[in-house]
Amino acid sequence: MATKFPKFSQDLAQDPTTRRIWYGIATAHDFETHDGMTEENLYQKIFASHFGHLAIIFLWTSGSLFHVAWQGNFEQWIKDPLNVRPIAHAIWDPQFGQEAVDAFTQAGASNPVNIAYSGVYHWWYTIGMRTNGDLYQGSIFLLILASIMLFAGWLHLQPKFSPSLAWFKNAESRLNHHLAGLFGVSSLAWTGHLVHVAIPESRGQHVGWDNFLTTMPHPAGLGPFFTGNWGVYAQNPDTVNHVFGTSEGAGTAILTFLGGFHPQTESLWLTDMAHHHLAIAVIFIIAGHMYRTNFGIGHSIKEMLDSKAGLIGGKSQGQFNLPHQGLYETLNNSLHFQLALALASLGVITSLVAQHMYALPPYAFMARDYTTMAALYTHHQYIAGFIMVGAFAHGAIFLVRDYDPEQNKGNVLDRVLNHKEAIISHLSWVSLFLGFHTLGLYVHNDVMVAFGTPEKQILIEPVFAQFVQAASGKALYGMDVLLSNSDSLASTAGAVWLPNWLEAINSGTNSLFLTIGPGDFLVHHAIALGLHTTTLILVKGALDARGSKLMPDKKDFGYAFPCDGPGRGGTCDISAWDSFYLAMFWMLNTIGWVTFYWHWKNLSVWQENLAQFNQSSTYLMGWLRDYLWLNSSQLINGYNPYGTSNLSVWAWMFLFGHLVWATGFMFLISWRGYWQELIETIVWAHERTPLANLVRWKDKPVALSIVQARVVGLAHFTIGYVLTYAAFLIASTAGKFG
């Protein structure tokens, strides 16, 4: 007899109900719990899957390159990047008749196409690509790379080529490889590409496979490098009149520290970026060689963590030198701990990418493609949110599955768990304080505006934030501090090291240090409320994962356990899983506030209508009326009685997103018994209906478990929420700026 899905669990495969399918899907990636899984096998499987992951990424990027080269307008866009709209790909089957076909035949194309809002055109142009041929070459190269990765993944699962457990647990060598090899060398390689290809192309000098070995990126060659006269490489940078992609106004410098933006492209100087990547390469290559591997020199991480020597003097413990003994084994033997730390880092970095992409745009002319700027910011902030929640989820799984209290007695982990009540209660009062005060201010202001006395609003200037902006050089507030005070030491140094920075921060035409007022103060605190509450839920979920006052023995129940009836006071909503389920909603809503704020603030800057944001953002009705309602009008008019526009696809997506989102509540606000009764009734009717009763099923249909229904509900809520806002964001921005 053929074995049933799932093959990895005999227990589930023999389940006679539809639970088999649901739990099979839910535990497919929980390798640890699969039948016959050994620790070594677990590491090998995960290692091999990394190659599969890379293959998917390369295939995806290859597809973007291929479709733009085949169906896009890259070569036309390069000639006039500010006015030609970039095409992502053709639309093969435009529905809804000739009107829709006409509406989507746009951006100079002869057939219906989609516009690209991902910024890839700007990226490829900046890094030196100039022809469709370049794009095709890139896509074929990545396709070959994806194939190699798939082969490598398969190869590392074969007994002869699968690494041993000891190899995976060699922390120092792994750090050497990741820091020096992956981060350091790839940054060095990228510097090489920028210096040898991108910078010459930006100055009108074509560099291709035919001449890259004979074209010198700098007239002095390697002479200054070997003689230690490195300053030569920074001399004669591009002038402020440089026309990107031509030799007009171009210099010869390759590694600079100019600061600010290229006046024409409004993006960071390529030579500054090359310098940045070179510095990162040097730092990481050195960092990768600090640990003891083959030669018996360098740091041993275990020795450092177990050391009793103090930071200063011989004291082994104290406020600034908390004990870390036992952490090496704990971290090195727990994949969940490692993953939690990696996700926490990646989450922060992804959010930083969102911030920096708009404040310091790295790609030529992207700052003027407003829809792309909005899409990239929102995209990266949402992804950061998902990743951060994942960090806490795996931290909790670590505490349930891998944490050994004996091994960690008295160290920092133990201390955190021992005073978890203090941590949780502090987060709680901060959340309560922020929530009541922020909402109180908004509601007060709403009432004042509603009663026709807007002058009675409570408006607070963000003086501390303005001070930070002034210290960084913003002169508008007249605070005369550090970089905004021309007599200060900071200004003297800044004039030497970052000559263009002050001009950039005070120009008023970019998104660097936007002027802030009372509306910003309020929404900043609303976002702080969301962040602190999300953190409270996540931290409490993780710290109580093994046990709490109500239920001291959660360990053997695992990470996700359902309600246990009224026994022990009821175990509803107290598993670690339940906390992350709740935190997901807070995370999504918080990032909603973040992206609403960013989008409205920037719309007012781009439309040169700052007064609208400043006046309407101080009360809730202003947000609802002047941001959400006002900006959804273009969207809702994608289809109307007078015809259709190229926003119609977003209008449909907006509608469909709401539908998916609302469907989520059917699973979220419901009980198993109701569904079980409904299922029994449908089954009964089915079995008694002629023709229909010829079709039977082997699994007995049963209602979803509480945890499953929550997952299905959360998935609909999340996907619907993101689809709805994505459609709103893109259509409202593209509707205004094309």
UniProtKB/Swiss-Prot annotation:
<keyword id="KW-0148">Chlorophyll</keyword>
<keyword id="KW-0460">Magnesium</keyword>
<feature type="transmembrane region" description="Helical; Name=XI">
    <location>
        <begin position="711"/>
        <end position="731"/>
    </location>
</feature>
<dbReference type="GO" id="GO:0000287">
    <property type="term" value="F:magnesium ion binding"/>
</dbReference>
<keyword id="KW-0603">Photosystem I</keyword>
<dbReference type="InterPro" id="IPR020586">
    <property type="entry name" value="PSI_PsaA/B_CS"/>
</dbReference>
<keyword id="KW-0472">Membrane</keyword>
<dbReference type="GO" id="GO:0009522">
    <property type="term" value="C:photosystem I"/>
</dbReference>
<keyword id="KW-0793">Thylakoid</keyword>
<feature type="transmembrane region" description="Helical; Name=II">
    <location>
        <begin position="135"/>
        <end position="158"/>
    </location>
</feature>
<comment type="similarity">
    <text>Belongs to the PsaA/PsaB family.</text>
</comment>
<keyword id="KW-0157">Chromophore</keyword>
<dbReference type="GO" id="GO:0016491">
    <property type="term" value="F:oxidoreductase activity"/>
</dbReference>
<keyword id="KW-0560">Oxidoreductase</keyword>
<protein>
    <recommendedName>
        <fullName>Photosystem I P700 chlorophyll a apoprotein A2</fullName>
        <ecNumber>1.97.1.12</ecNumber>
    </recommendedName>
</protein>
<keyword id="KW-0408">Iron</keyword>
<feature type="transmembrane region" description="Helical; Name=I">
    <location>
        <begin position="46"/>
        <end position="69"/>
    </location>
</feature>
<feature type="transmembrane region" description="Helical; Name=III">
    <location>
        <begin position="175"/>
        <end position="199"/>
    </location>
</feature>
<feature type="transmembrane region" description="Helical; Name=VI">
    <location>
        <begin position="374"/>
        <end position="400"/>
    </location>
</feature>
<feature type="binding site">
    <location>
        <position position="675"/>
    </location>
    <ligand>
        <name>phylloquinone</name>
    </ligand>
</feature>
<feature type="binding site">
    <location>
        <position position="674"/>
    </location>
    <ligand>
        <name>chlorophyll a B3</name>
    </ligand>
</feature>
<dbReference type="GO" id="GO:0016168">
    <property type="term" value="F:chlorophyll binding"/>
</dbReference>
<dbReference type="InterPro" id="IPR036408">
    <property type="entry name" value="PSI_PsaA/B_sf"/>
</dbReference>
<dbReference type="GO" id="GO:0015979">
    <property type="term" value="P:photosynthesis"/>
</dbReference>
<keyword id="KW-0812">Transmembrane</keyword>
<feature type="binding site">
    <location>
        <position position="563"/>
    </location>
    <ligand>
        <name>[4Fe-4S] cluster</name>
    </ligand>
</feature>
<keyword id="KW-0813">Transport</keyword>
<dbReference type="Pfam" id="PF00223">
    <property type="entry name" value="PsaA_PsaB"/>
</dbReference>
<keyword id="KW-0411">Iron-sulfur</keyword>
<feature type="transmembrane region" description="Helical; Name=IV">
    <location>
        <begin position="273"/>
        <end position="291"/>
    </location>
</feature>
<dbReference type="InterPro" id="IPR001280">
    <property type="entry name" value="PSI_PsaA/B"/>
</dbReference>
<feature type="transmembrane region" description="Helical; Name=VII">
    <location>
        <begin position="422"/>
        <end position="444"/>
    </location>
</feature>
<feature type="binding site">
    <location>
        <position position="572"/>
    </location>
    <ligand>
        <name>[4Fe-4S] cluster</name>
    </ligand>
</feature>
<feature type="transmembrane region" description="Helical; Name=V">
    <location>
        <begin position="335"/>
        <end position="358"/>
    </location>
</feature>
<dbReference type="GO" id="GO:0009055">
    <property type="term" value="F:electron transfer activity"/>
</dbReference>
<dbReference type="GO" id="GO:0051539">
    <property type="term" value="F:4 iron, 4 sulfur cluster binding"/>
</dbReference>
<keyword id="KW-1133">Transmembrane helix</keyword>
<keyword id="KW-0602">Photosynthesis</keyword>
<feature type="transmembrane region" description="Helical; Name=IX">
    <location>
        <begin position="579"/>
        <end position="600"/>
    </location>
</feature>
<feature type="transmembrane region" description="Helical; Name=VIII">
    <location>
        <begin position="521"/>
        <end position="539"/>
    </location>
</feature>
<dbReference type="InterPro" id="IPR006244">
    <property type="entry name" value="PSI_PsaB"/>
</dbReference>
<comment type="subunit">
    <text>The PsaA/B heterodimer binds the P700 chlorophyll special pair and subsequent electron acceptors. PSI consists of a core antenna complex that captures photons, and an electron transfer chain that converts photonic excitation into a charge separation. The cyanobacterial PSI reaction center is composed of one copy each of PsaA,B,C,D,E,F,I,J,K,L,M and X, and forms trimeric complexes.</text>
</comment>
